[in-house]
Amino acid sequence: MKALAALPLARRLVRRHEAHKGDSGKVLLIGGAPTMAGALLLAGRAALYSGAGYTVLLMLDEASAHVVPEQPELMVHAAARYPDPAQALVSIAPDVVAIGPGLGLDEVAQRWLEAALAWDGRLVIDADALTLLATHPHLLDALRQHPQPAALTPHPGEAARLLNTTNHAIQADRAQALQALVAHTDCIVVLKGQHSLVGAPGQEPQVCGQGNPGMAVGGMGDVLTGCLAALAAQGLRHHLTLFEATCLAVQAHALAADRLVAQGVGPVGLTPMEVAVEIRRVINS
């Protein structure tokens, strides 16, 4: 399998002197149901540190939508203010939609995923949204009919649900599982784990050589989602395909964690937010 070598793609993100925030794209992140607002906040902060021009959080927990400590740059909308999710996407007009961090699995979550799948722009799907795809065939059908391949970022458990198999089977042959996920969804897929794998229709599978056990902590995947969404948004005007943005996000995320561990920050106690900040340094270097 080909080694992931995507870091040089970051050179395409260099800002022109006359650049404005619109050039770096608008990211919409959907999730943050009650008790899970932190997942969406982590993804949002990661999007900021990864260079998104605008970052909008659509928070399903209305109470949490009014509290964003230490990150006033985030524009937070309560999902309850939008009775029609499809119209919300039209109104917000994002360049990229990322859905899943803290989304939940109830009917409200399903309605927002249906709207995201009907939207025709760049799409990143993670966490609870992947479980909804696995348990609702009509959502998987909608994903396959999306006008362009979405980027999916399952961990082994989510991958097992998508393929109706076991976590053990996924881990026993991760390369085969990646190929099966790509074929099953017709999407770009990041199979997370030790040395994450990246695959896509018509692309040679790639393996990330970076990463460490300190990344095995809740919220680390949310940071990857935010980073990927931000790079995908910038890529629209900086000539990065969604597959390229995905590869760059995976490697920058893992390298950021490795750099921190090399500095003595972890592996025990390494936090997702520390990785999000370090991603900024990786991209700019």
Across the structure, where does each feature detected by a protein language model lie?
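Small-residue (G/A/S/T)-rich helix-start motifs and N-terminal tracts that mark the onset
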Residues: 1-124, 131-151, 156, 160-285
